[in-house]
Curated annotation (Swiss-Prot):
Name of one Pfam family that matches: Ribosomal_L32p
Name listed for the protein in its UniProt record: Large ribosomal subunit protein bL32
Biased composition (Basic residues): 1-19
GO terms for biological process, alphabetical: translation
Ranges where the record places region Disordered: 1-22
GO function terms (MF aspect): structural constituent of ribosome
Organism encoding this protein: Clostridioides difficile (strain 630)
Presence of the UniProt keyword Ribosomal protein in the record: yes
Gene Ontology terms: cellular component: large ribosomal subunit
Family, similarity comment: Belongs to the bacterial ribosomal protein bL32 family.
Keywords: Ribonucleoprotein, Ribosomal protein
Length: 58
């Protein structure tokens, strides 16, 4: 019966397990002010609004 010659390190074990559980890319949402696509939980790059308030003036 085959037996490992050396103990597998914690780093190698975690890297091997992480290869099977890759994160999915976040989707876009439409801005409620200008209806342009933007990343969620971020200021809209087109109009500068976040949560209904103008954060960045254009």
């Amino acid at each position: 019966m085959a037996v490992p010659k050396r103990k597998t390190s914690k780093s190698n074990t975690k890297m091997r397990r992480a290869a099977n559980s890759k994160m999915e890319a976040t989707g876009f949402v439409s801005c409620p002010q200008c209806h342009e696509p933007k990343l969620p939980h971020r200021v809209c790059p087109d109009c500068g609004y976040y949560k209904g308030k103008e954060v960045v003036s254009k």
